[in-house]
Amino acid sequence: MAGLKLQAVTKSWDGKTQVIQPLTLDVADGEFIVMVGPSGCGKSTLLRMVAGLERVTSGDIWIDRKRVTEMEPKDRGIAMVFQNYALYPHMSVEENMAWGLKIRGMSKAHIEERVREAARILELDGLLKRRPRELSGGQRQRVAMGRAIVREPAVFLFDEPLSNLDAKLRVQMRLELQHLHRRLRTTSLYVTHDQVEAMTLAQRVMVMNKGVAEQIGTPVEVYEKPASRFVASFIGSPAMNLLDGVISASGDRFELPGGLALPIGADYRGHAGRNMTLGIRPEHIALSSQAEGGVPLTVDTLEILGADNLAHGRWGDQKLVVRLAHQQRPAAGSTLWLHLPEHQRHLFDGETGQRV
């Protein structure tokens, strides 16, 4: 197995604006890292730099303790799996999986051994003579993974490999990818815009925004302790409720427009008068009552999801979403009294967006 290291890596197209700002990342041997973020955040550019398909403006890339910054892609010990499968339509499954080894001059017996083993792992044994047009989307993606596996790379690079699949098949392929990584334990760098993929597949998640790694941590860490307002808004479905306000002069209240306020147990006197954003996830809001000092939410709409429901409404001028149990279906226009537990709240600096 091999590790991957990015050391102060940057990318600029025009020599002025950095689309990837200085980024350092250590990926341990056998670790599965997922880069997630919105379109244009730089995640695919970074993956292509690791692959050698884009030049690094500054910084270094190391694979298996070897500096590969200027190496050709074929010499880096990587294998890529793409969104569009990139299979040769005129070749069989077996030929597609073997082609990369064949052009490298590997012996026929060795190629056959690797292809058979990869086919067994991916349950493609009975499909080796078929052409890509005879396969389902999930089967084609497994062939693309098989072609990467036979190379026995130091690092797997996945570029949104599940994006072309329907919702049901994506769930199935996520499970297959988890199983595959447990078997192979190959260092993997995976790019997606889908936070569900990121949270379910990753050992660590790197949340990217405008060329910056906003947070690198386990799925639990980025969910429970988002490092910034951006991470808080991006990770979680539905998104975290974010309320803009100000810390009171006494440091013990969070004041919102329209005369609304929430007590804050911790002493924030050092931040008195500063603009802040208070966040709380819809699933962390509890039902309460007026007598218990609950926050009144006027329900606008209700989304019935099956296992649970989402109530969208207003507290004064503030929009809030709360996750409710399946049997709780408040009508539009009704009032819910809510409790926002202090230990589930998050505060972010109003200017920098960083966690306080």
Curated annotation (Swiss-Prot):
Q: Which residues bind ATP?
A: G37, P38, S39, G40, C41, G42, K43, S44
Cross-referenced PROSITE patterns:
ABC_TRANSPORTER_1, ABC_TRANSPORTER_2, UGPC
Compartments annotated for it: namely: Cell inner membrane
Task: Name the enzyme group at the top EC level.
Answer: translocase
**Catalysed reactions listed for this entry:** sn-glycerol 3-phosphate(out) + ATP + H2O = sn-glycerol 3-phosphate(in) + ADP + phosphate + H(+)
| Any Pfam family the entry gives | OB_MalK
Can you tell which superkingdom this protein's organism belongs to?
Answer: Bacteria
Membrane topology summary? Peripheral membrane protein
Naming one, the record's GO cellular component terms include: ATP-binding cassette (ABC) transporter complex, substrate-binding subunit-containing
Q: Do you know which InterPro entries this protein is assigned to?
A: AAA+_ATPase (IPR003593), ABC_transporter-like_ATP-bd (IPR003439), ABC_transporter-like_CS (IPR017871), ABC_transpr_MalK-like (IPR015855), ABC_transpr_MalK/UgpC-like (IPR047641), Mo/tungstate-bd_C_term_dom (IPR008995), NA-bd_OB-fold (IPR012340), OB_MalK-like (IPR040582)
* Record-annotated ABC transporter domain positions: 4-235
Q: Which UniProt keywords apply?
A: ATP-binding, Cell inner membrane, Cell membrane, Membrane, Nucleotide-binding, Sugar transport, Translocase, Transport
One GO BP on record is: glycerophosphodiester transmembrane transport
Q: What is its main location?
A: membrane
**NCBIfam families tied to this protein:** PRK11650.1 (NF008653)
Instruction: Family membership, please give it.
Output: Belongs to the ABC transporter superfamily. sn-glycerol-3-phosphate importer (TC 3.A.1.1.3) family.
Subunit structure, per the record?
A: The complex is composed of two ATP-binding proteins (UgpC), two transmembrane proteins (UgpA and UgpE) and a solute-binding protein (UgpB).
Name of the protein in question = sn-glycerol-3-phosphate import ATP-binding protein UgpC
Q: Which gene encodes it?
A: ugpC
